[in-house]
Amino acid sequence: MTTGVAVMSSATAASTATATAAATARIPLFLSRNNSSATVCSTLRCRTITRTRTRARLAICCEVALKSDSSTGFDSSSSSPPEEDEELKKNLEKVGCKVKVKSPLKVYHVPKLPEVELTPDMVGVIKQYVGFWKGKYISPNYPFKVEYRIDVPDRGSVKLVVHLKEEEFEIIAE
């Protein structure tokens, strides 16, 4: 579909908008005027005419698709394989559990601290499993979001969030 843009005076633009609305009877068009601007909208296009002191400006608005094509994308009618559902359920049950890391890890992106080392004696809480997002299975490198609270000298308690693999932590008593 090709769309052209024409530059015209504000009076001509308003009369052309009403003529376009009358000429295309099969496409419902709506014309509204508010605060020195006229808007012509249809199911196929949306044009906004703005009047200024020197000239009229014609802007083309894009429409957003509300439904995806049924031949592509995620089909909600088909069910996922049972082993994926069991794995998802098993991983979602871990959310809220207290965990410890198995070996020391360095965390670099902590505000106002150069680096923090997580040791096996520190306890964190799993906040989220990110392997299932917006109805689709994804394969993140570090699927578990774990929150730690550490005491830093001269700053008090600092909350930091770390993404970990399942092999990097062990679950302790809930």
Curated annotation (Swiss-Prot):
One of its GO terms (biological process) is photosynthesis. Keywords: Chloroplast, Oxidoreductase, Phosphoprotein, Plastid, Transit peptide. Residues 69-81 have a biased composition (Low complexity). One of its GO terms (cellular component) is chloroplast. SUPFAM superfamilies: Electron transport accessory proteins (SSF50090). Residues 1-62 form a transit peptide. Gene3D superfamilies: 2.30.30.50. The modification Phosphoserine is found at S70, S71. The keyword Plastid applies. Heterodimer of subunit A (variable subunit) and subunit B (catalytic subunit). Heterodimeric FTR forms a complex with ferredoxin and thioredoxin. PANTHER family: FERREDOXIN-THIOREDOXIN REDUCTASE SUBUNIT A1, CHLOROPLASTIC, FERREDOXIN-THIOREDOXIN REDUCTASE, VARIABLE CHAIN. Belongs to the ferredoxin thioredoxin reductase alpha subunit family. Variable subunit of the ferredoxin-thioredoxin reductase (FTR), which catalyzes the two-electron reduction of thioredoxins by the electrons provided by reduced ferredoxin. This is Ferredoxin-thioredoxin reductase, variable chain, chloroplastic. It comes from Spinacia oleracea.
